[in-house]
Amino acid sequence: VLVKCGIKDGMTLGFHHHFREGDYIVNMVMEEVHKMGIKDITICASSLGKAHDPIVPYIEDGTITNIQSSGVRGKIGEAISAGKLKGLAIMRSHGGRVRAIESGETRIDIAFIGTPTCDDYGNCRGIGGKSDCGVLSYAMVDGDYADKVVAITDCLVPFPNFPAHISMTCLLYTSPSPRDTE
């Protein structure tokens, strides 16, 4: 999916945090970005917590050089405080993130939306499946404004997945998560 989306150095990748400390989307995507040798990535995430500690080596090696978020906790916060992030750490409220994206101040090249359920056409819902989280409100702005949008799910459901929190008209690709087979 990263190749199909045209991933390259210097891009901004969008993520949300509906799964809280159970999120593995950021780690999974950034591991692949790192393996591809891509550098100078800006992560624009609604929040980053202890679940994302595995991306610290990518901060240290320059894979990730900027972070925009509502907050950072755990080892990411420690790495930023220790001066390991080569670029900027911009902290905004959730609404401030939405405003920055809607106004064009922040441009997301590729958004990765972890969704509890999704059909083959990309209709995403935060309800159902193994990872039920409610609505996908933090990710709606990513779906509407990112240049390319990828839905990642551990539960593909029959079309139509309705009512969709994020419509298939926003999506470019859907991708079953490795956890889809668990």
Please provide the spans of the model-predicted regions.
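An acidic, phosphate/nucleotide-engaging active-site surface
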Residues: 64-126
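His/Asp/Glu-rich metal-coordinating catalytic cores
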Residues: 156-172
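N-terminal active-site beta-alpha-beta segment that forms phosphate/nucleotide-binding
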Residues: 1-78
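Short acidic, glycine/serine/threonine-rich loops at helix termini
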Residues: 25-28, 54-60, 79-82, 123-129, ...
